Amino acid sequence: MDGILKAVREKIEIEKQLQHQLETCSADICAAMFEEFAPFPHNSNGQLCWPAHWDADVGDLRKHLLRFFEYDDCFSGCRAQRMWPLYLEAAFPFMRGMPLIDMLTSLVVRTWHHRSCGKAWLQSVEFFCGKANLSLAALEAGLKAAAMDKTLNPEHNVLEAPGLRLALLLLTATVPGALEWLGSPCNSYVVLCRAQSLRSADNMYLGDESKYFVLEGNCLGDISALLVLLGVMTLLRF
C-alpha cells in the first residue's frame, strides 16, 4: 500500500478508537457508574469525619467558604445561599436541613478522602460538553476524561437530581490539578436576547424569571458557579 494511504488509514483507525472511547466516557456514563464515589467519610454516629491532621485544612476551607458567603451577600443578593441548598438537597436528600457551609464542607472533604485513598482517577471533566471536542482532545493526549451533556444523554440533565448527582460525583472523582471545564449554556444572556430576557443591572441580570428559558439559564448559572467553587476549594489540600 502507498505510504500516504497507509498513514491515512492508520489515522482513520485511531480516530475511530478515540470516538469509541469518547462515547464510553460521555454519552454512556450515568450516576450509577460512579456510585463508588458516593459515600461520605463518617463515624459510627453518622457524622462527617476526617483525619486529625486535616483539621487545619478543614478550618481553612470553612474560612474561605465564609468569605465567599460575604461576597455573595454583597454582590449577588445571597443568591448562592438561597438556591444552592435546594440543588444539593435534590442530589443528596440526606443533606436536607443542613447549613450550606456543612453541605459544601462535606462535598470537599469527600473529594479529599477519595484522593487520599487513591480512588480518584479523572484528569479531565467537561460539563455541558456539547460534542465534547475538548474531551476528545484530552483522550488523544492520553488523559482519563469524562464529559456530560443532556444532548448526549437525558440522564446528564443537571436540572434533574440524577444529573446533578452525576456532576458532583464526577467532581469527587478528580485527581488534584484535574481540568474542570464548563461550557454553560448562555443563550438567555446574549445581547440579542435582552428584549426577551429583560436582563439588566437593575435586576442583577436575573431577568424575567416568569419566562422558562430565563429561569433555566439562571439555574444553570447557579449550578455552574457551584461546580466552579467546589473545584477551587478542593485545591486547598493536596
Regions found by a protein language model. Give the residues of each.
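Short Cys/His-based metal-binding microdomains
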Residues: 1, 6
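Conserved active-site and SAM-binding loop architecture
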Residues: 8, 12-238
